[in-house]
Amino acid sequence: MTEQGTEAAKLQVESWYQKDKVLGVFLPECHESLAGIIAGRLREYYQKPAIVLTRGEEAVKGSGRSIDEYHMFKKLTEVSDLLLKFGGHPLAAGLSLEEKNIDEFRRRLNENAGLTEEDFKAKVWIDVPMPVGYVTEHLVRELSCLEPFGQGNEKPPVSYTHLRAH
């Protein structure tokens, strides 16, 4: 179900919202418990803030995941007149709104996004490049002790120099 929802969301983005700075997709048939996972996948894939909206019993519910350059909670406060409820922090949020307000919600978030194309470029922070000879099975086992990886505990990026691909 998550894969189907992710593919449906990507199809919407590719068809209608590719130029948007904040992705807002409405998946009425998707279960609300999957919205955050799908929003996270959209954020990773497009390197843009993403909000996935689903049809709830009483209102449309949404879950958002953001990038460092976009404070999602603050931006939701700017459109709070359209929302029934919302909460969150800089990188994630939950919300509810009436279905009739979806287009205006999406339009205003994009109009006031304050993001540039530079903000959508993935950033990788490398503390120290590592000689390839340091990568051993033992190191891989040691790194696995740091799991699970995710927000706030990212997979350690590794950088090598002087390598050639043939």
Give the ranges of each region predicted by the language model.
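Hydrophobic helix-and-loop "lid/oligomerization" segment in the mid-to-C-terminal part
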Residues: 1-101
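Non-catalytic alpha-helical coupling and interface elements of nucleotide-dependent molecular machines
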Residues: 14, 47-48, 110-114, 145-148
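Conserved strand-to-helix beginnings and helix N-cap segments that scaffold or border functional pockets
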Residues: 35-37, 106, 137-140
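Short amphipathic alpha-helices in soluble, non-transmembrane regions
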Residues: 76-79, 108-112
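Internal, active-site/partner-interface "lid" segment
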Residues: 91-107, 116-135
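Non-catalytic interaction/regulatory segments
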Residues: 131, 140-155
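Extended amphipathic alpha-helical scaffolds
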Residues: 156-160
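Conserved small/polar residues in nucleotide/adenosyl-binding loops
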Residues: 161-166
